[in-house]
């Protein structure tokens, strides 16, 4: 009887481990037997639960990837087929080739973003932090988007000022600022404003990037940094883009030792605030 009380729970745990090893992430071991075996079963079950969560996230991630890839591919194929079979008249070919080019670029950015996220979350991207002026990065990003800003008749405010030193990886910070400014340009109406502000607070530098426009619905604010989140429920962030840019921002800011959040007054403005270690 004593042997059965010991071997029974061990056999149960062994069977659960076999099922888990075969890919059944719902496998759990009964928590019974002596204290040591019960503790072991609890530890096993906690591990199995974590693996199940990871597997579910992976499945959702792959489903989102498939959906995001399918959309531009469908558009590209449809327009190319239309040009080949004559549905699209020759005089309109240039226009639709332009759309195909845009969708191809979107596809390339999506693939690059997914590769970036995979490497960042796996800790495979080295951090090369250094002390430098934050405003140089902000200015470089704005200048790189100068044509889009002019086309959108957007007013830029708060750019420049005295040097403000941060200690961070310049590539990380450039990507964060670029992604936020890219969103701001997309959602700022003609004649609207994108403004920049930054100041040192203790051993951190707080950066604020704000744009006028529809803003983000209050119920959407907690989710804007989630992977693949695209705000269908808010007028401030629609389905344009991959839903990966702000998620990448959060990862990069956190890796840099800072934090990021969004603020908004729906119908008026949206502001992204993030912190970075101050340079000495």
Predicted stretch roles:
Residues 122-127, 165-168:
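Conserved micro-motifs of the catalytic ATP-binding
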Residues 211:
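Acidic ATP/Mg2+-coordinating residue in the GHKL
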Residues 216-230:
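Short conserved segment of the HATPase_c
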Residues 257-263:
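Glycine-rich ATP-binding loops of the HATPase_c
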């Amino acid at each position: 009887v004593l042997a059965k009380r010991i071997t029974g729970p061990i056999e149960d745990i062994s069977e659960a481990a076999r099922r888990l090893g075969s890919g059944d992430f719902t496998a759990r071991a009964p928590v019974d037997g002596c204290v040591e075996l019960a503790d072991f079963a609890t530890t096993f079950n906690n591990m199995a639960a974590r693996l199940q969560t990871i597997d579910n996230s992976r499945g959702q991630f792959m489903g989102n990837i498939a959906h995001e890839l399918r959309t531009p591919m469908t558009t590209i194929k449809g327009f190319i087929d239309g040009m080949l079979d004559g549905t699209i008249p020759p005089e309109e070919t240039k226009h639709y080739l332009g759309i195909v080019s845009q969708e191809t670029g979107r596809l390339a950015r999506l693939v690059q973003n997914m590769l970036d996220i995979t490497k960042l979350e796996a800790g495979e991207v080295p951090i090369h932090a250094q002390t430098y002026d934050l405003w140089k990065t902000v200015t470089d990003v704005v200048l790189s988007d100068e044509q889009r800003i002019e086309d959108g008749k957007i007013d830029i405010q708060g750019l420049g000022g005295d040097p403000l030193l941060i200690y961070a990886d310049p590539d990380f910070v450039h990507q964060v600022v670029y992604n936020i400014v890219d969103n701001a340009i997309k959602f700022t109406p003609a004649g609207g404003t994108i403004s920049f502000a930054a100041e040192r607070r203790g051993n951190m530098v707080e950066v604020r990037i704000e744009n006028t426009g529809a803003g983000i619905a209050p119920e959407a604010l907690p989710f804007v940094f989630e992977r693949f989140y695209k705000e269908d429920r808010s007028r401030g962030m629609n389905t344009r883009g991959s839903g990966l840019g702000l998620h990448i921002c959060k990862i990069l800011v956190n890796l840099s030792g800072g934090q990021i959040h969004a603020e908004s007054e729906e119908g008026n403005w949206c502001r992204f605030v993030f912190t970075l270690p101050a340079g000495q």
